[in-house]
Amino acid sequence: MTTQNQNTHQQTVFAMVVGEHSGDTLGAGLITSLRQTHPHAKFIGIGGPKMLALGFESLFAMDELSVMGLVEVLGRIRRLLHVRKTLTDFFITNKPDVFIGIDAPDFNIGLELKLKVKGIKTVHYVSPSVWAWREKRIFKIAKATDMVLALLPFEKAFYDKHNVPCTFVGHPLADDIPMQSDKVLARDKLGLAQDKKILALMPGSRGGELSRLLEDFFESAKQLQAQDSELLFVAPMISEQRANQFNALKAELAPDLDIEIVLNQTQQVMAASDCLLTASGTVTLEAALIKRPMVICYKFSPITFFLGRRFVKLKWFSLPNLLTNKSLVPELLQKDVCPENIVPLVKERLYQDQSQLNDSFTAIHQQLKCDASKQAAKAVLDVLSSKLLSNNK
């Protein structure tokens, strides 16, 4: 890392760090919006492929930070600490005008705190789930950030209650996904039959998620197909690596099950489907915005679940339910993830009218559609302006 400090009067430097694909999407949208007012700005830190395509300079590969769960993080802790120290030293030496940590809170908030102490303005984009567990983290966030950018309205209310600066910007997915999704067109593009029911199998984007969920997903699919031989299964995968893992587990657990794998077209698969059997995460919000019924499952590693459950204060864990404050979609967690529970829930959503659910999904969409990248850029520039004002005093 020999990049020279180019923070001159002519060039504004925005430092950013993202840890996974959803953050890469947010970062790319933010870069695009910031470039409208700062066309010659420099963007540097850790970014993903979408950010790199916009000229972002990444000091480490994004995959360095793509870990989830206490056990998984502990296995990589030395490397993560090395990366964070290297970034801290780099940004203190080569001071950016503002640092924006995008999600990855356990990594970014510690980094933001070290930078803010050195006089660097910091923004955290995507609130950690402090409203759900480890609520006292909000005091560290208050010390570490000049502004939190929240994607969800109930998050801002939580920060306001604790007098921590926060701006609700809306969710970029709500801007990108059309209000009405076209099932016929999606099936045409994917070459899928128009006259059959389709269930999407979506066991997550991380290797650990696939290994913990797929056995129950495959067994549920077998039972569903035994009851409806015309039922089709499609599985969207975000990478060849995940597709290979999926195929290996399928060969072991369900060699006779016919499943169409589609790479890098998750939203298209959702739109083409009648129901989704999915892991928890941002994908459940995508499903709601595409207006598709879903059954949500999640399994933590046993140790992670044991260590974390005492800190969790949630009635629900999926975004559609949290946003509506009710059991809008079914959730299954840990031992409840089993074919005995999955099969009847999927059947109900495949074969019964879902128009009332669709109305609720539309209300969510309208609430979150705010031109998020533009709102986020405005908030970042407000923080930058406050820095310039304080420097000129």
From Swiss-Prot:
One of its GO terms (molecular function) is phospholipid binding. The keyword Lipid metabolism applies. GO terms for biological process: lipid A biosynthetic process. Its EC number is 2.4.1.182. Pathway: Bacterial outer membrane biogenesis; LPS lipid A biosynthesis. GO terms for cellular component: membrane. Condensation of UDP-2,3-diacylglucosamine and 2,3-diacylglucosamine-1-phosphate to form lipid A disaccharide, a precursor of lipid A, a phosphorylated glycolipid that anchors the lipopolysaccharide to the outer membrane of the cell. NCBIfam families: lpxB (TIGR00215). This is Lipid-A-disaccharide synthase. The gene is lpxB.
